[in-house]
Amino acid sequence: MPMVTRRLRDPDINPCLSESDASTRCMDENNYDRERCSSYFLKYKNCRRFWNSVMIQRRQNGVQPSMPTAAERDEILGAMQKMPY
């Protein structure tokens, strides 16, 4: 597996792995009809936007690593009581 693909499949690096998988699975199941999967695409886009804003905020505050690990992300989402995306 190429290094780029391996990094994208790593849950510590890609916070929206499940949303990405869901949108890909929807495309496969619906014969690549994009309109049927628009809700999955929107959820993935909102996920990326949310974690990008978290990453920017952490970088501004000097927190390393700028992208929280998978365990830290679970804590953040648990503290919010609901999914922000």
Swiss-Prot record:
Predominant localisation class: mitochondrion
Subcellular location: Mitochondrion intermembrane space
UniProt keyword annotation of Disulfide bond present: yes
Keyword Cytoplasm attributed: no
Any GO CC annotation of this UniProt entry: mitochondrion
Origin superkingdom: Eukaryota
Record SUPFAM superfamilies: Cysteine alpha-hairpin motif
Gene3D superfamilies (alphabetical): CytochromE C oxidase copper chaperone
Motif window: Cx9C motif 2: 37-47
S-S bridge residues: 16-47, 26-37
PROSITE patterns the UniProt entry points to: CHCH (PS51808)
Keywords from the UniProt entry: Disulfide bond, Mitochondrion
Domain CHCH residues, every copy: 13-55
Motif Cx9C motif 1 boundaries: 16-26
UniProt subunit comment: Monomer.
Similarity remark: Belongs to the CHCHD7 family.
Protein name: Coiled-coil-helix-coiled-coil-helix domain-containing protein 7
Organism: Mus musculus
